[in-house]
């Protein structure tokens, strides 16, 4: 099969304690690919993870000289927006081939993922395409501000969430980890297409 031919050319690391072999290759574009075959499993999980999370608020864009600062919550906002394309919702494309898609943002990463038992090539291509080809308009960005604003309000009503971020804020006075991953209603208002 294609997977067997692929892993035969990759670097492999065997973890004796887990009795697992992890295959790795760094592509010419810098993308790291990891494959962890699981005997006896029917479902395949695929993730596309970027090293861009909620604490990554300042950076120098490729080809630029100056540092820019983006609004708090931008990584989470992008996570939401990437699933929306001009031709429709990317979730529908995954559903059409029996795959389930999702995403999450942490302090240091954003991950886009799907699980499926069939049509892995089609779903992987969909994942790679939608993550690398964003689609934004002022209208869709403004609509998303409302959706994420509701999400922020919902989490503000959860006692465990408030306790967690209260503790983080008290421990890290000057570090961006103290700010909710989704940002604030005020910060997401500063996001434009």
Predicted regions and their residues:
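His/Glu-rich zincin catalytic helix
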Residues: 2-90, 187
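Acidic/histidine-enriched segments that form metal/cofactor-coordinating
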Residues: 2-5, 9, 86-193
């Amino acid at each position: 099969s294609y997977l067997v031919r692929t892993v035969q050319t990759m670097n492999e690391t065997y973890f004796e304690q887990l009795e697992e072999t992890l295959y790795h290759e760094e592509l010419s574009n810098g993308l790291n690919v990891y494959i962890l075959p699981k005997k006896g499993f029917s479902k395949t999980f695929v993730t596309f993870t970027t090293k861009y999370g909620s604490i990554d608020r300042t950076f120098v864009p490729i080809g630029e000289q100056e540092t820019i600062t983006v609004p708090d919550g931008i990584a989470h906002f992008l996570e939401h927006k990437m699933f929306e394309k001009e031709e429709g919702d990317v979730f529908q494309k995954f559903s059409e081939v029996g795959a389930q898609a999702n995403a999450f943002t942490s302090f240091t990463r954003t991950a886009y993922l799907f699980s499926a038992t069939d049509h892995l090539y089609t779903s992987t291509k969909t994942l790679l395409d939608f993550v690398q080809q964003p689609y934004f308009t002022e209208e869709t960005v403004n609509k998303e501000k409302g959706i994420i604003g509701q999400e922020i309000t919902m989490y503000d009503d959860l006692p465990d969430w408030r306790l967690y971020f209260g503790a983080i804020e008290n421990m890290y006075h000057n570090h961006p980890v103290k700010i909710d991953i989704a940002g604030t209603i005020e910060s997401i208002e500063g996001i434009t297409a």
